[in-house]
C-alpha cells in the first residue's frame, strides 16, 4: 500500500467503488487519472508504444530510486528515470505529479525531483509536458504507524518559495512555468492565489492546479451575463463549501448579494469525518453537512456543489443520501454543478425533484 494514497486512508465498509485503484494506463490516457508505471507488463509497454497512447498522467513523487521505492512501497518504483527515457525515445508524453510529504521528499529531494523531470521538458515534443506539485492529504483513518505528517502553514510557504524560484528560472529558459503548485498550497499558506495568466492553458486543472482561479474567472464572466439588478420574490440562501476556498469565494458572494432581493451566505466547513482542519469542497460528507448546518437559519434553501455527491447518484462519500440530509435539515437543498447552474439556481430555485429526474436520465 502506498502510505499517502487517499484510497487507503478511508474507513472500511463503504461502497465498493471508493476502494478501486485505477492504476491503469488506459484510464490515465482517457480520463487523466494518475498511474505510477510500476505495474505495467512488457505487453502493456508494447501496446503503449504501438498505439501511441499519449499523454499519460504519472505519479512520480521522487526520482531518487530508494526514495521512490520507500514512498510507493514497490521495488520497481526506482526505475522511473528509465521509464521516462523509454517514453522520451518514442516521443511519448506525460503530465507528472509530485505529492510532497514533509520530511520525506521535500527540500533538496523535491528540488532534485523537479530538476530531473524538467530535464525531460525539451525538444518539439517534450516528454514531460507539465508538472504539478501537490501537498499530501491525510485523514484520521490512516495507519498511526506511518511516517507522514500534515503540511503546516510554514512548510507550505517554504515550498511555494522553492517552486516559485524554479518557475522564474524555467520561464526564462522555456517561456513557460513547466511546473505548477496545486491551489491547496496557497490556501494552507494563507497567501493570495497567482493571477489567471500564471496558469497558461491550465495543463494540470484536474490536479487542482488553477481550479479556483478558473472558477472565479468563469463566475465573473457568467455573472456579468446573467445577474439582474433585482429579483422578486426575495430569497435567502446558504452556499456550502469546503473551508479551503472560504477566503477566495468571499468576493463572489458579495457580487451575488448586489442583486436586490437576493441574499447568499457562504458557510465554509471543515471535515470532522476525515479529521481535517482544512477541507476542499469535494471531500465534505453528509455527516459534515449535517453537523455544520443543523441549528442554523438556512433561509429558503442550501446551495450544494454536486461534486460532493457520487456521479449519477445523490449520495455523499460517507454513503449518507442527500434525501436523508434534506429530511434532517427540513429545508430544500439545491445541488449545483458549475458556475452557470449556481447562478441560475440562485435566480430560479430549481427543486430537488428536478435534480433527481436529471440523475435518472444519466
Task: Show where each model-derived region lies.
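Auxiliary Fe-S-binding modules of radical SAM enzymes
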Residues: 120-125, 132, 138-362
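Structural preference for beta-strand elements that scaffold enzyme active sites
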Residues: 55-57, 93-97, 130-132, 178-180, ...
Amino acid at each position: 500500500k502506498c502510505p499517502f494514497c487517499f484510497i487507503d486512508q478511508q474507513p472500511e465498509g463503504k461502497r465498493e467503488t471508493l476502494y478501486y485503484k485505477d492504476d491503469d494506463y488506459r484510464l490515465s490516457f482517457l480520463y487523466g487519472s494518475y498511474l505510477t508505471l510500476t505495474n505495467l507488463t512488457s505487453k502493456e509497454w508494447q501496446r503503449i508504444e504501438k498505439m501511441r497512447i499519449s499523454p499519460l498522467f504519472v505519479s512520480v513523487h521522487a526520482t531518487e530510486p530508494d526514495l521512490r521505492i520507500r514512498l510507493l512501497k514497490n521495488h520497481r518504483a526506482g526505475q522511473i528515470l528509465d521509464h521516462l527515457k523509454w517514453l522520451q525515445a518514442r516521443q511519448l508524453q506525460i503530465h507528472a505529479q509530485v505529492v510532497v510529504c514533509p520530511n520525506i521528499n521535500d527540500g533538496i529531494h523535491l528540488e532534485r525531483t523537479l530538476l530531473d523531470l524538467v530535464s525531460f521538458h525539451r525538444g518539439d515534443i517534450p516528454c514531460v509536458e507539465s508538472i504539478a506539485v501537490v501537498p499530501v492529504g491525510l485523514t484520521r483513518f490512516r495507519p498511526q504507524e506511518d511516517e507522514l505528517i500534515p503540511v503546516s502553514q510554514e512548510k507550505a510557504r517554504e515550498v511555494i518559495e522553492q517552486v516559485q524560484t524554479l518557475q522564474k528560472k524555467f520561464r526564462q529558459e522555456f517561456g513557460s512555468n513547466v511546473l505548477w503548485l496545486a491551489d491547496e498550497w496557497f490556501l494552507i499558506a494563507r497567501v493570495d492565489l497567482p493571477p489567471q495568466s500564471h496558469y497558461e492553458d491550465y495543463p494540470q486543472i484536474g490536479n487542482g492546479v488553477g481550479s479556483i482561479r478558473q472558477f472565479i474567472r468563469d463566475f465573473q464572466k457568467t455573472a456579468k451575463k446573467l445577474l439582474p439588478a433585482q429579483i422578486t420574490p426575495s430569497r435567502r440562501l446558504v452556499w456550502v463549501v469546503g473551508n479551503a476556498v472560504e477566503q477566495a469565494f468571499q468576493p463572489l458572494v458579495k457580487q451575488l448579494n448586489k442583486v436586490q432581493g437576493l441574499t447568499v451566505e457562504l458557510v465554509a466547513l471543515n471535515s470532522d469525518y476525515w479529521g481535517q482542519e482544512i477541507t476542499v469542497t469535494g471531500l465534505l460528507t453528509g455527516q459534515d453537512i449535517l453537523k455544520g448546518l443543523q441549528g442554523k437559519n438556512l433561509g429558503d434553501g442550501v446551495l450544494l456543489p454536486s461534486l460532493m455527491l457520487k456521479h449519477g447518484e445523490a449520495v455523499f462519500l460517507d454513503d449518507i443520501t442527500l434525501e436523508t440530509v434534506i429530511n434532517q435539515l427540513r429545508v430544500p437543498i439545491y445541488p449545483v454543478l458549475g458556475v452557470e447552474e449556481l447562478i441560475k439556481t440562485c435566480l430560479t430555485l430549481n427543486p430537488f425533484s428536478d435534480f433527481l429526474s436529471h440523475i435518472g436520465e444519466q
